[in-house]
């Protein structure tokens, strides 16, 4: 890997649908066929299924906590995207890192993820996070992201009087 490049803003939109649409377009336009989603167990796993569903015509995998000994293959079953055990993932076209990895409470070291990236040699490294967690944790200075999708969540809670 060369020097970490500064990323420039390409587009801003509201909602999860535009994020999924832009992701699908990015994968298609980059001729990506094999994608490894990497994220924290529990928190990132549903996002891997959601983003995997957006590119369901591609070969998709989930690597929990960056551990290649626990790789799951994403498959379409009767209720949508699900995960099955898989062995021996050694090369992918793209790695998608989810922001949960950078959250201190999950304890995934950035160096472990850098080793994983080197081992799988992807054409593209894509970050997907919310609330700028990669930037807050300094991972944007450590990981050579080709693209970074950063969403912001505003929560409104209502109740009856």
UniProtKB/Swiss-Prot annotation:
Domain of life according to the entry: Archaea
Pfam family, one: DUF2124
Family, as annotated: To M.thermoautotrophicum MTH862.
Designated name of the protein: Uncharacterized protein MJ1183
Naturally occurring in which organism (per UniProt): Methanocaldococcus jannaschii (strain ATCC 43067 / DSM 2661 / JAL-1 / JCM 10045 / NBRC 100440)
